[in-house]
């Protein structure tokens, strides 16, 4: 069985401030001297430099830990007349190691199709970033028992465009749309069922990838339900939304992941 290091990735969405970043580091910089879990901070792009500076300033306090920086989105294009967009190279230059791709809010609010998501996945890897690929079903799809079908379609398009081995340098986040920002989380059993399906799906084309890829759960994760979720055999941590904005809650989630 592969030893997959748990990950807790905090997606601030369009929230936070430079002051929040300082508060987070003040809270956990000296308490994360442990590399048993990886912590990724994904602030809005405007605050990436603030977080980068805090990582550097707290380098000694964070010694022995794995705290990284990630972005919430990137353009599928390398450069050009794309007002408001940020390229993979720009994110790499900013110090990012990870980037969230295909979040349900991007798909739903900004019309990102699975083809665009696959292109962004490729753009991330082209510039040395590790994509955190989000997949998940809507409430109606779950009620219609189409969860596996929807997720398979979302995975397959990325595989078709990028190849299976592209997942050797990728993270997957299962985020059921009916749980994102609703306060209603999937049960540990529901999460495990879907994570096991994703792992099996990838194992069919590459046993190595299937066994080693990290699969995060995202959708109303809190300190009260994280231990049970992270204890599932195919759940390798969480993509955290609201709780990542609360320094105490986020530290609790990191601590839970470190003992999972």
Swiss-Prot record:
tRNA processing among keywords:
no
Q: Which pathway does the record list? A: Carbohydrate biosynthesis; gluconeogenesis; Carbohydrate degradation; glycolysis; D-glyceraldehyde 3-phosphate from glycerone phosphate: step 1/1
Q: Which residues form the active site?
A: 103, 175
Q: Where in the cell is it found?
A: Cytoplasm
Q: What is its main location?
A: cytoplasm
Catalytic activities: D-glyceraldehyde 3-phosphate = dihydroxyacetone phosphate
The catalytic activity of this protein is classed by the Enzyme Commission as 5.3.1.1
Q: Which UniProt keywords apply?
A: Cytoplasm, Gluconeogenesis, Glycolysis, Isomerase
> Which Gene Ontology molecular-function terms are recorded?
triose-phosphate isomerase activity
PROSITE patterns listed in its UniProt record: TIM_1, TIM_2
Q: What class of enzyme is it?
A: isomerase
GO CC, alphabetical: cytosol
Instruction: Give one GO biological process term.
Output: glycolytic process
Q: Which family does it belong to?
A: Belongs to the triosephosphate isomerase family.
What role is this protein assigned? Involved in the gluconeogenesis. Catalyzes stereospecifically the conversion of dihydroxyacetone phosphate (DHAP) to D-glyceraldehyde-3-phosphate (G3P).
What protein does this entry describe?
A: Triosephosphate isomerase
